[in-house]
């Protein structure tokens, strides 16, 4: 029994260095991410791109693949809920990546009700720990 327990402890210890490499990047507890424009419940004209401005406090913005303390890059979520916080943020038309360190973008959406939310990702597009995300806002394109 002792040999079995010792073997299990040894095997688990071999996994520890690997588990530490892929974990989320730490974020300060007072980090604050927000959408500066458009405003919640704002009506925007259809057929015309509009600016989305990203705001971040108590952290910095760095391009993807740059691992530096207290930095990350923006992901704009359109008409979706937050993804799993322990996995890479999807990259599709509802999860826009700004891996060059952008702090604003132009978006054009079809007429209707839409939601926008920001999520900060680390150098590997994984949400920080604790996750840093904005309030979800609603906009209307008419």
Specify the residue positions occupied by each region the protein language model found.
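Bacterial N-terminal signal peptides
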Residues: 7-17
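Short, compositionally biased P/S/T/A/G/V-rich stretches that sit at domain boundaries
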Residues: 23-47
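A glycine-anchored, Pro-Gly-centered beta-turn/N-cap motif
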Residues: 48, 110-112
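Short amphipathic, basic-aromatic surface patches that mediate peripheral association
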Residues: 55-66
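Short coil-to-beta strand junction motifs in C2/discoidin
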Residues: 66-74, 133
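Short acidic/polar inter-strand loop motif in beta-rich domains
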Residues: 83-85, 121-129
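Short beta-strand elements
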Residues: 130-142
């Amino acid at each position: 029994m002792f040999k079995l327990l010792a073997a299990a402890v040894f095997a688990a210890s071999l996994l520890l260095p690997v588990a530490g490499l892929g974990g989320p990047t730490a974020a300060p507890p007072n980090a604050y991410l927000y959408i500066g424009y458009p405003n919640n419940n704002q009506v925007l004209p259809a057929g015309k791109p509009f600016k989305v401005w990203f705001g971040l406090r108590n952290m910095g913005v760095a391009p993807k693949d740059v691992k530096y303390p207290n930095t990350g890059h923006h992901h704009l979520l359109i008409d979706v809920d937050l993804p799993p916080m322990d996995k890479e943020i999807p990259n599709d038309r509802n999860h826009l990546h700004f891996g060059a360190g952008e702090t604003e973008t132009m978006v054009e959406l079809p007429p209707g009700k839409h939601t926008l939310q920001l999520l900060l990702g680390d150098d590997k597009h994984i949400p920080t720990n604790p996750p840093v995300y904005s309030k979800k806002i609603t906009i209307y394109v008419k």
